[in-house]
Structures are given as C-alpha cells and as structure tokens.
C-alpha cells in the first residue's frame, strides 16, 4: 500500500463529487505495502480508504470488490465498497481504476498471541465457507504460472545457492500442482495475503470473557480462487513464526489450526500435503519479494520487504513441518 500515484487537493475534490460522503476533513497517503496507492480519507460522514489500483484492471476489479460485498453480507467483517453516484463500485482516477471502501475499526497486532491466532483461524474458515456460493471465478494471480514467468528474471541477481533453491522448489511445486491429490483439495475464494498487518483487532466488550475482538480482514486485492489450504498456509507462515528465524511457534500454529477446524475440518488430502502447501506459501512470497526488491517500480513512498525472510521460512519448512493437529470429537 505505497503511493505510486499522487492525488492533489483538486484531484480529490473532483473525485469526491461522485460520492455522497460529505466534506473532506483529512486525506493522507499510506506508506506501507508495495502494490497499490492507498490513502486514508476522513469526511463528515466517516472514515474510509481510497485505493488507486496500479496493476489490477477494470476487468479484474469486480471480482475483488464484489467478493468483499459478498463476504460482508455473510457476516465476515471486511471493508465495504462505497457505490458512486452511478451505482458503480469503482471509477477512474488518473487513468487508473480506483475505489473507496469503509475503514475498519481496530489496530493491527504485530506481536500476536494464542488468542489472536484463535480469532484469525476461526474467521478464516468462516471466510472460506462464506465464499462457496460466490459466483465470480478468478484465479490467484500470484500462483504457479506467475512464478514460472518471473523466476527467470530474478535469477541473474541471486547467488548460486539461492538459484538452486529457487529453481528446485519451483520444480517441486510444479509436480505437486499437477498431482491428483492437489486437484482434490477443497478450493474457493481465498484472501491469499492474510498477514498480521491485514487484520485489525479491537478491545472485546466487557463480560464476553475475551481480551480481544477481531475487527476485520482487509486488503483483498491479492485474493483469488485457490486451494483453501494455501490460504491457511500463507496465514500460518506469518502469524505463527519466529520473525528472526522463520521457525514455527507450535503453540500459536496449533491454536490457529485447531480453531480453523472447529469451523471447517481438514480433509485427508489436506493433511497429507500440509508440508507441500506451507512450502508453496513461503515460495510465493519469496518470489514476489525478490522480484520487488531487484526489479522495483518508482514510487513516492516505497518500502520493499526483505526477501531473506521468506527464504528462511522456505528452508525451515523444507527441513521441519509438524503435522496438522487433530481435533477431538465425541466419537474419539
């Protein structure tokens, strides 16, 4: 969520004429992230986020915005796109598609504990089930075909050892994706980027027995139809790791995965390929971070992520992956 496209006061005034959101009180760019131009927008009607989509096209965008509306209608806390005066959920700003969505309450928890992971696991499973009847179908655009297309451009910048890992894991994942077991994995709309900074928490209401309350999931602009287990793996690889080493925190991982299973139990195929999918989740972000680090775009406020973080996670997942935890039922 860096700012690649600047928006002046006059640009904003012209844009806001298409919305019934009152008068603008504050407007500022959001410096984190690397994909779209994002701005916090405060008006006399409330708080919002304006996003200018730097890569997504007008043809692709309805999948994401309609998905957010669909999930919200099914009780999943996500930003709600605001219709324009013509009823459309997005328009054009500086020749690029742009939209306004509601701003969720709460703050990111960058040092999550077990209780945070329980909340995330349960809500991720609810998101997956809520998306089962979503009518649009668009693949995860950062999956195997994207890796195969972009790895050759990265290779000249990295060491021989990194190249061996990058190309070897690509071959491993290509084989996994071609397998019958992979085809049998449950699938549907996925967030595909559910990192700690894409989830908000607020204080729980008194008397609920909980210290935290999940405020919502946001930044759905990497979402796509994929295997649900991939979404779980991406989430675990961020929420349940030691950030210095990439080693899984067993207590947090166990809490998140057990909580997920209380809503949607894992299948036998998912249990069999948990290690492969954790590796796929790590590989996806190692490739994209290498690409953004060595082949960056110009931006006003760009903070590229360290590619080494997901290299460490990938190496660790290849070496050590615990099995998915079982959940106890009345029949056990």
Curated annotation (Swiss-Prot):
Its EC number is 2.7.1.39. Coiled coil: none annotated. It comes from Burkholderia cenocepacia (strain HI2424). The gene is thrB. Keywords: Amino-acid biosynthesis, ATP-binding, Kinase, Nucleotide-binding, Threonine biosynthesis, Transferase. The lineage of its organism: Bacteria, Pseudomonadati, Pseudomonadota, Betaproteobacteria, Burkholderiales. This is Homoserine kinase. Pfam families: APH. SUPFAM superfamilies: Protein kinase-like (PK-like). It catalyses: L-homoserine + ATP = O-phospho-L-homoserine + ADP + H(+).
């Amino acid at each position: 969520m860096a700012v690649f496209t600047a928006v002046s006061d006059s640009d904003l005034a012209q844009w806001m004429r298409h919305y019934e959101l009152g008068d603008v009180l504050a407007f500022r760019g959001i410096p984190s992230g690397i994909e779209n131009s994002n701005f916090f927008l405060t008006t006399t009607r409330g708080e919002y986020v304006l996003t200018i989509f730097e890569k997504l096209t007008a043809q692709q965008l309805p999948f994401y915005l309609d998905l957010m509306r669909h999930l919200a209608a099914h009780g999943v806390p996500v930003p709600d796109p605001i219709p324009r005066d013509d009823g459309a959920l997005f328009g054009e700003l500086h020749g690029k598609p742009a939209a306004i969505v509601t701003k969720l309450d709460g703050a990111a928890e960058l040092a999550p504990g077990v209780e945070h992971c329980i909340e995330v696991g349960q809500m991720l499973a609810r998101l997956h089930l809520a998306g089962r009847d979503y009518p649009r179908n668009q693949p995860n655009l950062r999956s195997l075909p994207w890796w195969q297309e972009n790895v050759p451009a990265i290779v000249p910048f990295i060491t021989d050892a990194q190249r061996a890992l990058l190309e070897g894991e690509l071959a491993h994942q290509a084989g996994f994706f071609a397998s019958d077991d992979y085809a049998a994995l449950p699938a549907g709309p996925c967030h595909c980027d559910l990192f700690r900074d894409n989830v908000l928490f607020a204080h729980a209401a008194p008397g609920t027995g909980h210290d935290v309350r999940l405020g919502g999931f946001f930044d759905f602009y990497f979402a796509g139809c994929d295997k649900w287990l991939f979404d779980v793996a991406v989430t675990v690889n961020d929420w349940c790791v030691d950030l210095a080493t990439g080693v899984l925190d067993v207590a947090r991982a166990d809490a998140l995965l057990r909580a997920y299973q209380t809503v949607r139990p894992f299948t036998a195929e998912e249990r069999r390929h948990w290690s492969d999918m954790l590796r796929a989740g790590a590989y996806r972000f190692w490739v994209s971070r290498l690409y953004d680090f060595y082949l960056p775009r110009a931006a006003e406020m760009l903070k590229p992520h360290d590619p080494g973080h997901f290299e460490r996670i990938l190496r660790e997942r290849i070496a050590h992956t615990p099995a998915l935890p079982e959940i106890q039922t009345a029949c056990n």
